Amino acid sequence: SPSQAMAALLPVLPGSKTEQGSVMAWGCDPDALSADPYTGAHSAVYTSVAKIVAAGADYHKAYLTFQEFFEKLRNEPVRWGKPFAALLGALDAQLELSAAAIGGKDSMSGTFLDHDVPPTLISFAIAPVCAGELVTTDFKSAGHGVYLFYGGTAEQKTAAWECFTALARAGKVASAWAVENGLAEAVMKMSLGNKVGFAAASTALDWYQPMPGAIVAELTEEIPDAVCIGITTAEKTITIGSDEASISELLALNDSVLESVYPTKTQDAGTVESFTYETEKRAAPAVKIARPKALIPVFPGTNCEYDTQRALLEAGADAEQFIIRNLTSADVADSVERFAKAVKDSQIIVIPGGFSGGDEPDGSAKLITAFFRNAAVKEQVTDLLEKRDGLMLGVCNGFQALIKLGLVPYGK
């Protein structure tokens, strides 16, 4: 069962732990946006928020950000009307949910010759959540009622979300799915993870109608005021009225759609010959320190130094953050001098990721590479790698720096 949202614990200082995290999801229906940019954008907002609600978040605490892509507007009113309608639909959804969009990215140049990008507004929703409050998408076991939380108006939808959240906080929600392309898709994808079947309780519903904002939930007990659409079963099938299909068949069909683009299976290569070699000589590192010191330079824009330090500490290293100060030229010179001395006493350098200063224009990691090309720093880094058998790692922006410094692939 695919996940509809990403969840992450908030970064904390090394040595500390937290159960507080964030959950984030997106919403976008290209077909709906092409048919009606206003309705498509409005639905995108509701879909993104419904996904984080289904994952366990409280919609009252949600914030949004948008990405928009449209054709070149030129001087044609019809073209101007598409982003205007989309943004109006997104704004109305924000007002209905009291959820503000912060920042975003837009492009009004999506035209090449006579080809235009379709009207596109992608809504991203984010909210705080505790790890223990997260709800996953896969049916857990047979015999559970499957319920629909939905309403036709904004007030009815948010009331349904509040009811769902209260049940989730009470531990009565085993799994949940934010409906996008219909109830049939929802129960199918919820069935895939644990091969738990589903039998529909009613055929009166339109099982293939998109329902932006709707949530399907597997509950551990009966709820009299909610709409029960079916029940989970031990049979590995999905039954809706007279239609029945095996979960394995549906899984194969689901995976086959993009199999030619993103293969999930490898061809049988036949018998693979095994090669072995034995030697009495074993290489050992030149570093004879049980707890090596790892130096973490923190540049303006670096954003994963805490996670990097914690990972190194858990692996047994003595990790230290080194703040690169660049407020004045004297600060930079002082940072260079102190960093070169710190490298001399270290066995590992780890450059964390982020959007370092000077990334644009012309690519990333320019500030990092300029710093490491300083003669004093270069001398100590070369000594670390070539004479003291030290290590150097780079993450994201830091890895870009390793490439541009020439350290990848040849270590020089």
What is each stretch, according to the model?
Residues 44-49, 164, 186-191, 368, ...:
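Buried hydrophobic packing segments
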Residues 1-155, 202, 298-300, 346-371:
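Glycine-rich phosphate/pyrophosphate-binding loop regions near the starts of catalytic domains
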Residues 311-314, 319-393, 399-410:
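Flexible gly/pro-rich beta->alpha loop and the following alpha-helix that scaffold active-site loops
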Residues 54, 189, 193-196, 221, ...:
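Short, well-ordered loop/turn and helix-capping segments at boundaries between secondary-structure elements
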Residues 23, 176, 197, 348, ...:
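Short glycine-aspartate micro-motif
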Residues 140, 148-176:
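A glycine- and small/hydrophobic-rich beta-loop-beta segment
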Residues 1, 41-45, 161-173, 378-387:
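Short, hydrophobic/aliphatic alpha-helical segments
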Residues 79, 83-121, 165-295, 302-339:
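Glycine-/charge-enriched secondary-structure boundary and capping motifs
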